[in-house]
Structure formats: C-alpha cells, structure tokens
C-alpha cells in the first residue's frame, strides 16, 4: 500500500499565517480562517435558499469553504496587495495556485483523487458554489479587519476600506442579509453579546 502525505500537508494549515505583512493583535492561520469561511459560506447558502429562492447545497459549500485555501500549504499566503498588484502577477500566481492544487491532489491515493478533485481543483468547482465561497472569504477578511480595528489596531483600516469595495462588487441579497443580520455583533464586546 502506497503512503500518502496528503493529510500531513493539510495538518500544516495551522502553520500558515494570514496577513503576513500586517501587524496583528490576534494572529490568524489558514486553518482557523478556513473553518470560519466554511461557517459563513454555509450560512450564505442557507440564506440564499430560505430567503431568496436559491437551490444550493449548503453542506457542499461548507466543504468547499474548508478546502478553499488548502493549496497554501504549498504556496504560503500571498498578501493581497502583492497578489493583485498587476494583472501579470495575478495571472502567474493563479498558475502557481493551480499547480499546488494539482500537487495536493496527486498526493492522494488514486482511487480518492476523483472524490477530492471537486474540492481541491478550481477547474472542477461549480462556479455558482465558488461565488458563495469567495463571498464568505471576503466577509471573513472583513470581519478580521473589524476585530483588529476594535482592538485598536489601525493597521487594518486600509484593508477594511478595500474589503468594503470588494463586498460591494460581490454583493448579493444573501450577502446583504448576512451583513445586516450578523456583522454588527462583531463590533460589540463579549458582555454586549452575552
């Protein structure tokens, strides 16, 4: 039986720090971030289905959220201002991400690669599901900015402004519902939400 290093790599998600160029009050790794994205993506899918006549699979979308940054165990987390500095860099980095996805997929025993491809390979992911995960990813980054700003860390002020624009461009009724229903609580203290 051939040995697989797939899950040993995934276990290293907790070693990949997000926001590597930012001074953070509370550090965040991609494992923590991916779980939060899964929670939020699941909620967005439920909201879409229950409030806006959607027909999504919330559990599948939650899984996509869990796996959405797994390629970063091979690439690290590239800061957004660098990743999208210009179209050429963005295009080249996308190629690196795709290669990392394929490398991760190849680490699995062959009989499971087909099962994991729709979670790991961005070419195989349903585009409508991907949109929801990207919305959740942006929302979670925005929530991180709120957390840092509320802790007095102004390092995240520009990131918050940038993410507000991103949220506007990715806006959907379910995202607006989430923002209006859940986000204000992130500005409150533990006593205020208890």
From Swiss-Prot:
What EC number(s) would the UniProt record show? Answer: 3.1.3.89
Q: What class of enzyme is it?
A: hydrolase
The Gene Ontology CC terms held by the record are: cytoplasm
Task: Tell me which SMART domains the record gives.
Answer: HDc
GO terms of molecular function:
5'-deoxynucleotidase activity; metal ion binding; nucleotide binding
Q: Give residue ranges for domain HD.
A: 30-142
The residue stretches assigned to a coiled coil in this entry are none
What subcellular compartments does it reside in?
Answer: Cytoplasm
Looking at the UniProt record, the site noted as Appears to be important in orienting the phosphate for catalysis sits at: 18
Among Gene3D superfamilies, the record links this protein to: Hypothetical protein af1432
Quaternary state and partners of this protein? Homodimer.
* Function statement: Catalyzes the strictly specific dephosphorylation of 2'-deoxyribonucleoside 5'-monophosphates.
Q: Which family does it belong to?
A: Belongs to the 5DNU family.
Provide the protein name: 5'-deoxynucleotidase PBPRA2627
Q: Which organism is it from?
A: Photobacterium profundum (strain SS9)
